[in-house]
């Protein structure tokens, strides 16, 4: 439960909190649907979260009609399987739904403005396994700040650093683009050991 947003999240998923009378996640879905994304998987668990999202979106038919999205979007939901965090939720869903396309992962309460086609082109040009969206910020102390080399490779994130500690002013936006090979990476022994040891597999 998103305790920092109580009482707003007492009976509704954080992703369904309203901004300009729209659930936050509806704004995100519309941003992506306008760019041609048609298949969505909600990595949701817990009764309140599932009920909030399913009652509002169901399979996406009503959303598509509301915004004139044609062909319509298709929304699926995480199966009733335990996960160990946001990254592990991606693992669960790509396996369960046999996803073989690139995967764009974003938190449900994240509002963003991104050209997904440009991000995908960059991702493919770099032959990357994972591309993370970064944003320049004036105040680095409230974000995970990336250390990036001249070829745009990220070597580490420094979480909420002081100005002196910050390796750059590039903040993690919480937007992640995975190649289809993500399924094989999740099966690697070191990833499985990380899950067993830490009981968590989060994006951060």
What are these regions (language model features)?
Residues 51-103, 166-167:
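Short phosphate-binding loop-to-helix
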Residues 29-30, 51, 58, 91, ...:
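Short alpha-helix within the catalytic core of nucleotide-sugar-dependent glycosyltransferases
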Residues 1-59:
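N-terminal glycine-rich phosphate-binding loop and ensuing alpha1 helix
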Residues 41, 102-106:
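Short aromatic-hydrophobic micro-motifs that form the base-stacking/packing surface
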Residues 126-136:
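A short, conserved acidic/glycine-rich loop-to-beta-strand motif
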Residues 104, 111, 117-124, 138-140, ...:
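Catalytic-core segments of class I nucleotidyltransferases/pyrophosphorylases
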Residues 25, 93, 109, 123, ...:
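Residue-level signal for inorganic ion chemistry
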């Amino acid at each position: 439960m998103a305790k920092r947003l109580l009482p707003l999240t007492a009976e509704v998923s954080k992703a369904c909190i309203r901004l300009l009378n729209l659930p936050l996640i509806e704004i995100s879905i519309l941003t992506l649907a306008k760019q041609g994304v048609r298949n969505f998987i909600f990595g949701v668990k817990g009764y309140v979260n599932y009920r909030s999202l399913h009652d509002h979106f169901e399979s996406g038919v009503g959303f598509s009609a509301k915004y004139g999205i044609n062909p319509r979007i298709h929304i699926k939901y995480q199966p009733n399987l335990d996960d160990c965090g946001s990254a592990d939720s991606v693992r669960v869903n790509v396996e369960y739904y046999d996803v073989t396309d690139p995967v764009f992962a974003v938190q449900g309460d994240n509002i963003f403005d991104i050209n997904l086609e440009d991000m995908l082109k960059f991702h493919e040009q770099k032959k990357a396994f994972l591309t993370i969206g970064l944003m320049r910020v004036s105040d680095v102390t409230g974000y995970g700040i990336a250390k990036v080399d001249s070829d745009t490779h990220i070597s580490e994130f420094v979480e909420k650093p002081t100005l002196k500690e910050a390796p750059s002013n590039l903040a993690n936006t919480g937007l992640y683009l995975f190649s289809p090979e993500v399924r094989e990476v999740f099966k690697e022994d070191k990833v499985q050991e990380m899950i067993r040891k830490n009981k968590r597999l989060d994006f951060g």
